[in-house]
């Protein structure tokens, strides 16, 4: 009789092509997602050796990191390096015959939003991309993680990847979330508890009632930030919500193929009695709306807290806290809700989906951004943008004083025109608050979409629960 297995064990076992004596495995890769930044050298390597892409039908490319989010980008990109990389992806997609969504295509967007949206991401698959936040696709019960440029070339050429198996970690969120608390608060709270190295060497399976109650968009938010907790990947077992989301997508199975796939997908769960190497349990009702105060995703506190002092920490974290406070321009004991905000960014592969825009618009409806506030919404794909316009969300953002942009990675990272100026402080729905991440000497506070919208209205970090159901301003 086979020993009980975790979800990770099952997907791994189904994809091992060969295993060496030292445990190193050759894994088959079902989907390879490609963008303009980490792929040029890989494609050039194929050209130099006369190789083709092994499985072009399983390779999907989209420009997202470097592309401007303003009109006219399909004809002109001002930054030379960005233009060269986007043009290279255009050429490589054409030359090697892979699936491609150029900036002129309404389906273009952030690769981790486009993949699920188009039905490329399916339960039980192995998914890789030359990008840290590939774990997003784990929300579907897929084994998904980032790879380096040399590995991108290896997958393009062979549709396989050399790997050693990680350990199993379970993160269980019991009970239900309270009003105003979101998937973003879950994932930040987990990282705040375990630290950015807590998941190192592990693949995390997220489970528990609070996870099951999340939408697919929420589950993608949770898995998206698994890497920020040090994990190789994050997984959530597929269920009826997963199947309903996938059904009818352009590249999802149809007819008899759907029924066969569904039968397999229903086996993708952790067996009773399966062993995890590490277990973390958090009560959902104990999670509050949170915000980061420092320069690491683990620097997270409830919005009702105060800025910590270096002396609140031990070991090497004392100096790290001192450096973070200096960089962020904060004072120990200062209320988080007293921190003034210059800019609000709603978007990214963490929170750029339609549900995220709905949550922010609900807070903003009938209100205006604070005087002097720079605020932008960047939908995660052209299709998300179109749906938001159809639902009237775009007009809510525009009426409130937000910029309504085209799809792309935008201000998540300083690789395109959407950047912070030195000293500028941003409430951001993205995933990293490192020094300079959003622009040289820019200051980033990671929050949920609702929290970002609340900060835009008040001009400072704000508990979104204070604005929920608040009356709109008179016209």
UniProtKB/Swiss-Prot annotation:
Designated name of the protein: 3-isopropylmalate dehydratase large subunit
Amino-acid positions noted as binding [4Fe-4S] cluster in the UniProt annotation, renumbered to this chain: 349, 409, 412
Documented EC number(s): 4.2.1.33
Keyword Amino-acid biosynthesis listed: yes
Cofactor or coenzyme needed: [4Fe-4S] cluster
Subunit text: Heterodimer of LeuC and LeuD.
PROSITE patterns attached to this UniProt entry: ACONITASE_1, ACONITASE_2
Keywords linked to the UniProt accession: 4Fe-4S, Amino-acid biosynthesis, Branched-chain amino acid biosynthesis, Iron, Iron-sulfur, Leucine biosynthesis, Lyase, Metal-binding
Function comment: Catalyzes the isomerization between 2-isopropylmalate and 3-isopropylmalate, via the formation of 2-isopropylmaleate.
Example GO molecular function: metal ion binding
InterPro entries xref list: 3-IsopropMal_deHydase_lsu, Acnase/IPM_dHydase_lsu_aba_1/3, Acoase/IPM_deHydtase_lsu_aba, Aconitase_4Fe-4S_BS, Aconitase_4Fe-4S_dom, IPM_dehydratase_rel_enz, IPMI_cat
Family listed: Belongs to the aconitase/IPM isomerase family. LeuC type 1 subfamily.
GO biological process: L-leucine biosynthetic process
Domain of life: Bacteria
Gene symbol of the encoding locus: leuC
Reaction(s) catalysed (UniProt annotation): (2R,3S)-3-isopropylmalate = (2S)-2-isopropylmalate
Cofactor note: Binds 1 [4Fe-4S] cluster per subunit.
Pathway the protein takes part in: Amino-acid biosynthesis; L-leucine biosynthesis; L-leucine from 3-methyl-2-oxobutanoate: step 2/4
